[in-house]
Regions:
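Phosphate-backbone binding interfaces of nucleic-acid-interacting proteins
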Residues: 1-212, 347, 366, 370, ...
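Glycine/proline-enriched, intrinsically flexible loops and inter-domain linkers
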Residues: 24, 64, 200-301
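Beta-rich nucleic-acid/ligand-interaction surfaces
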Residues: 41-44, 208-210, 495-500, 524-543, ...
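Conserved mixed alpha/beta core segments that line enzyme active sites in large multi-domain catalysts
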Residues: 48-78, 261, 267-336
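Mobile "lid/hinge" segments at catalytic clefts and subdomain interfaces of large enzymes
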Residues: 121-134, 144-146, 161-162, 169, ...
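Terminal amphipathic helices with adjacent charged low-complexity linkers/tails
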Residues: 196-222, 399-427, 434
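Extended, well-folded interaction surfaces typified by the phenylalanyl-tRNA synthetase beta subunit core
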Residues: 420-582, 717, 770-773, 778, ...
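A carboxyl-terminal module marker
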Residues: 446-449, 596-600, 605-606, 611, ...
Length: 803
């Protein structure tokens, strides 16, 4: 943001400092200075001169000899400029003076050019009359060639640099995008007044307009209020185009803006002064005297002011009349409504458009302007009408036209006032300061923050969209208290050792167990194709099909958020199989996204899943063993139960199980269904397990109880049992735990047999049971009694001891 010091002083007249002091102090208060440019650099001994007499050069047809009154003397100057006449007032650099640069737009030397008296074709010359470029300014503002001629009230001997407004400096600041208010001269002046503790005088805007009603000239309808929260319009008739006054041209030129005429310059001036872009339309070109703010239609062609035809889509907001599009909202107007020299009546527009939409639209159509750059940052809707009224005031003051009374203001949802609790103690604790409430309120008063004593709340003005919480207010205190005044203090509080969150510790254990068992970690996309549901054989009404659609997908294959984690795993296993990798074991931690309702009204439930997949030298029990290792490492050994399930259509119906703890399902495990294998172009057998981490984590524990070495001997009993094949060992182990009591130390499966010696449909299962007492040596009869209880319960399942 470029800020000419003279323009700042127009609002802060008591500002008394050098440009460098201004830049340094503003930097300390939060406005980071990038550079300081002195407009009068290398301009020395330059005064106003009046040409009293002109004579032809005796030996050169293209040179003339001028007698120039420079106040206290008359000097002779030889020049070849064709545009000077007797009586003209011109800038003159005297003998020994210095000018900024050369002619024809050449690059200015670092130290300028020193002027000395000399002879031109035999005639002495005691100085030089200057063009505007030789004074370091731009030809955009002044005539393209020749000596600059003053058209204002100056007299010989006056400081020509001062008369041209070049005794000035422009400070460039790096403004962060959250400080939208500082992308304006008023905003920077407010900051300067607060920083230097000076009074701030913003422009006094008076009521403008004749007795007519603007509604008789124009109607406005906004169809997309979300993209255009406010639209204001006023009408000016009897337009009189002319050059804008020099003070306005100088200020615009200092900002790098080329002056054009009073009408265009006023819109640019107000944009820099208020930070509010404006646009002017020729009202006579607007059909039906109606403005409609709506989205474009995809494929529409529109020619902008720069003569380029651009293709629109439905996301681009357009300004239209009763028949056609006349402007791209917030970016550039149309060639069909441009202001020409023949304009009689104009429509002024000052609006607030959605910053995100403007940024995206600008990118889509490949057009970025000064206006779009400001809108992108998110403007204050309350500023639109203030800027509009200021522009109309300048129209009247400069005699550029007659303002029609009243204004159109479409503002359906005014900005709500933001109030924040004043918490001085918390601010001091955060900053390490000891600032009183009175000091805080004094700082806030400087930047127009109000205070409601009844509620102890700070009232945030609409232009400070960056203030949302206590920490933001604390930053304002720090800025004006002075960062360099905040004492250096050591951190207080009790030092504690770092510790991972419990959830991360559980995930680390699962990850370590998987890797110890030969698994490699991977990561797949959270985006999937709806076709995945068919590949996994999910029913049409399966809850997994209720997936969130992505508004800007990379393609159909990445168009929804996944609701099941298996697709990524199976795709990875299929890729490995295609590359002939043997004995592959993979795991992944990743979220699935379960919407609470569709379309989305709130954030979805993001559930972390640990997915394991393997093929090669393995079977169902290999993967089951890995899951059991994880549960053992999480203090859940012996608490899990495995129940056969047919709930998951993508798993083999006879080789799948749900894993539960305390009756709550934490995982499922099984072999992939053969049809699903075909869908993923895989052969052989693939086994997967999916663990729901939000269910598992609360059940895990890292508390461990250690017992000393046993003092008394153990007693073992081996049981070889015959049972139907559909009885699971988990059912047997539950009976062991229930009936074995405290004396049952452990049990271990050591044999499973099916064959000729066992009746068809039956199997033999053998367990070794270990019994031990902590306080005595067990007797055989005592153990036999417990075993009898176990056998009695097993008989109820149809389990018999093998003969």
């Amino acid at each position: 943001m470029d800020t000419p010091i003279s323009w700042i002083k127009a609002y802060v007249p008591d500002l008394d400092c050098t440009p460098q002091e201004y830049a340094d102090k503003m930097t300390l208060s939060g406005s980071n200075m990038e550079s300081v440019t002195y407009l009068d650099k290398n301009l020395e001994k330059i005064v106003v001169g009046k040409i009293e007499k002109i004579e032809k050069h005796p030996d050169a047809d293209k040179l003339i000899i001028c007698q120039v009154n420079v106040g206290d003397e008359t000097v002779q100057i030889v020049t070849g400029a064709p545009n000077v006449s007797e009586g003209d007032l011109v800038p003159v650099v005297l003998d020994g003076g210095r000018v900024a640069g050369g002619h024809d737009g050449g690059k200015n030397p670092e130290d300028g050019i020193k002027i000395k008296k000399g002879k031109l074709r035999g005639v002495e010359s005691f100085g030089m009359m200057c063009s505007i470029e030789e004074l370091g300014s731009s030809r955009d503002m002044y005539p393209e060639y020749g000596i600059y001629i003053f058209n204002k009230d100056v007299k010989p001997g006056d400081d020509a640099v001062e008369a041209l407004g070049l005794r000035d400096a422009v400070v460039e600041f790096e403004i962060t995008s959250n400080r939208v208010d500082c992308f304006s001269m008023i905003g920077m002046a407010r900051e300067a007044a607060a920083t230097f503790k000076k009074d701030f005088f913003p422009p006094v805007v008076t009521k403008t307009g004749n007795d007519e009603d603007v509604n008789d000239y124009i109607k406005v309808r906004v169809e997309d209020e979300d993209l255009c929260p406010r639209y204001t319009a006023r009408v000016v008739k009897n337009i009189k185009l002319a050059p804008s006054p020099e003070w306005m041209q100088r200020r615009l030129s200092a900002m790098g803006i080329r002056p054009i005429n009073n009408l265009v310059d006023i819109t640019n001036y107000v944009m820099e002064e208020y930070g509010q872009p404006m646009h002017a339309y020729d009202l006579d070109t607007i059909a039906n005297k109606e403005i409609v703010v709506r989205r474009a239609k995809t494929g529409d062609k529109f020619t902008t002011l720069d003569g380029e035809e651009r293709t629109m889509d439905e996301n681009v907001l357009m300004i239209c009349d009763g028949e056609k599009e006349i402007g791209i909202a917030g970016i550039m107007g149309g060639e069909n409504s441009m202001v020409t020299d023949d304009i009689k009546t104009l429509l002024f527009e000052a609006a607030c458009f959605d910053g995100t939409n403007i940024r995206l639209s600008s990118k889509r159509i490949g057009l970025r302007t000064d206006a779009s750059g400001k809108f992108e940052k998110g403007l204050d809707p309350e500023n639109a009408m203030a800027a509009m009224d200021r522009a109309c005031q300048l129209i009247e003051e400069l005699g550029a036209g007659e303002v029609v009374g009243g204004a159109v203001d479409v503002y359906p949802n005014p900005v709500k006032q933001i109030r924040l609790p004043l918490e001085v103690d918390k601010m001091n604790a955060l900053l390490g300061t000891d600032v009183s409430k009175e000091e805080v309120l004094e700082y806030f008063g400087r930047i127009d923050l109000g205070y409601d004593e009844a509620t102890n709340e700070v009232i945030v003005p609409s232009f400070r969209q960056d203030l949302h919480r206590m920490a933001d207010l604390a930053e304002e205190v720090a800025r004006f208290y002075g960062y360099d005044n905040i004492p250096v203090t050591l951190p207080n509080g009790e030092s504690t050792a770092g510790k991972k969150p419990f959830k991360i510790r559980v995930e680390d254990v699962c990850r370590n167990v998987a890797e110890q068992n030969g698994f490699s970690g991977g990561m797949t996309y959270s985006f999937e194709s709806p076709k995945v549901f068919d590949k996994l054989l999910l029913a049409e009404d399966a809850k997994e099909r209720q997936a969130i659609e992505i508004s800007n997908p990379l393609g159909e294959d990445f168009s929804i958020m996944r609701t099941i984690s298996l697709n990524g795993m199976l795709t990875s296993l299929s890729t490995n199989l295609a590359h002939r990798n043997k004995n592959v074991r993979l795991y992944e931690f990743g979220n699935i996204y379960i919407p609470k309702a569709l379309p989305l009204t709130e954030l979805p439930d993001e559930r972390m899943q640990m997915t394991l997949g393997m093929y090669g030298e393995c079977d169902f029990f290999t993967l089951k063993g890995v899951v059991e290792d994880m549960l053992d490492s999480l203090g859940l050994g012996g608490k899990s139960e495995y129940a056969p399930t047919a709930e998951h259509p993508f798993l083999h119906p006879g080789r799948a199980a749900d894993v539960t703890i305390d009756g709550e399902k934490i995982a499922y495990i099984g072999q992939i269904h053969p049809e699903v294998m075909d869908n993923y172009n895989m052969k052989g057998e693939v086994y997967v397990a999916v663990i729901d981490m939000p269910t598992l984590v609360p059940k895990a524990t890292f508390d461990r109880k250690y017992e000393g070495v046993a003092k008394f001997p153990a007693m073992k009993r081996d049981l070889s049992m015959v049972m139907k094949k559909d009885i699971f060992v988990g059912q047997l182990e539950k009976i062991f735990k229930d009936k074995g009591g405290k004396l049952l130390e452990s049990y271990e499966l050591f044999d499973v047999y099916e064959g000729d010696q066992i009746e068809k449909g039956y199997k033999s299962v053998a367990y070794s049971l270990t019994f031990r007492a902590k306080d005595r040596t067990l007797e055989d009869a005592e153990v036999s009694k417990i075993v009898e209880k176990i056998l009695d319960e097993l008989k109820k399942l149809g389990v018999e001891l093998r003969a």
